[in-house]
Curated annotation (Swiss-Prot):
Protein species of origin: Pseudomonas aeruginosa (strain LESB58)
Cofactor binding notes: Binds 1 divalent metal cation per subunit.
UniProt catalytic activity: a ribonucleoside 5'-phosphate + H2O = a ribonucleoside + phosphate
Biological function: Nucleotidase that shows phosphatase activity on nucleoside 5'-monophosphates.
Annotated protein name in UniProt: 5'-nucleotidase SurE
Length: 249
């Protein structure tokens, strides 16, 4: 099995090295990742300048682009052999609920949707590395068992691992995405020359985080697995829209 590994924290981030170490004994792994932190890049592509891959001493490929650029380039010409699946992470920080709309970690996995295997996005619910071994364990466990998984084509599995030692994790739960409340207001700053600027503030707290959600699972000490689909069509709105459009003609 051949796996393309990517992330959004950057090619030198500890999480991607941990993911490679977790999977390299079970698969032929190649790493293509951004040359700097691209958290929050979502599915953006770089279109205004060329991309320049650079192979590092450890064999990883660094790219001056986004997480989606990395996977897109890997699947469309940079790699001589097409991988079987894309695995993204291990992100240091949660990708729960609405986070998936902004996450470069999830976006990198989504870009691997055309491959025959399901794509995985792994996130440790912490900015610290103490419990990276826990995330490594579950990444190895889930990816190595993917061939027994029967899911529709183009399924992306968003996996969040609680910030706990392995012996304190209570198990794995299948979940839906929760929802966050509105984010905090951007923080206004003024530089010494009087020019105003803004820092994006923290994401909102869980507004819909009850039982069955990814938020609830990790808070209770479980690994959360949420299957994501790419059809963003809001089918339940069709009836109201049909009636509305009928009144316009």
């Amino acid at each position: 099995m051949r796996i393309l590994i990517a992330n959004d924290d950057g090619v030198t981030a500890p999480g991607i090295a941990a993911l490679y170490d977790a999977l390299a004994d079970h698969a032929d792994c190649v790493v293509i990742a951004p040359d700097q932190d691209k958290s929050g890049a979502s599915s953006s592509l770089t279109l205004e300048r060329p991309l320049h891959p650079q192979r590092l001493d450890n064999g990883f490929i660094s790219l001056n682009g986004t997480p989606t650029d990395c996977v897109h380039l890997g699947l469309n010409g940079l790699l001589e052999e097409l991988p079987d699946m894309v695995v993204s992470g291990i992100n240091l920080g949660a990708n729960l609920g609405d986070d998936v709309l902004y996450s470069g970690t999830v976006a990198a996995a989504i870009e691997g949707r055309f491959l025959k295997g399901p794509a995985f996005a792994f996130s440790l619910v912490s900015r610290l590395t103490d419990n990276l071994p826990t995330a490594m364990h579950f990444a190895r466990l889930l990816v190595s068992a993917h061939e027994r998984l029967a899911v529709p084509p183009r399924t992306v599995l968003n996996v969040n691992i609680p910030n706990l030692p392995l012996d304190r994790v209570r198990g794995i739960q299948l979940t839906r995405l929760g929802h966050r409340a509105r984010a905090a207001a951007p923080v206004k700053v003024v530089n010494p020359r009087g020019k105003e600027g803004y820092w994006i503030a923290a994401a909102g707290d869980a507004e819909d985080g009850g039982p069955g959600t990814d938020f609830h699972a990790v808070m209770q000490g479980y690994v959360s697995i949420t299957p994501l689909q790419l059809d963003r069509t809001f089918h339940e709105a069709f009836g109201g829209l049909d009636e509305w459009l009928g009144g316009l003609t």
